[in-house]
């Protein structure tokens, strides 16, 4: 997104600093964010299999193990919902071999949060700006 902001003074690092200050010090902004975030955080999450086939049930069980037992799901939700504060959020997915249900599998072991204030830009595969 380049040049689409209504207020051109609120861009880049300055925008992130303003958003961070607003969410931390403005009670109205903080309350509005909480109203949206709390229902998501307090929801009991589950995963349904794609079908009743045993293969789909096994996939569901593996995904549940990764997301709810290996990865800290509540921490992920807290961090993921910061997209509401800043307009975007980035995670690095980390995979490692793990024994799950007696079999060694490549499992999602971490969703590493990359704080918005540490990201200034990145390039896409065609070397065009992704976020500027």
What name fits each language-model region?
Residues 3-132:
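Structured, mid-chain assembly/scaffold modules that mediate subunit interfaces
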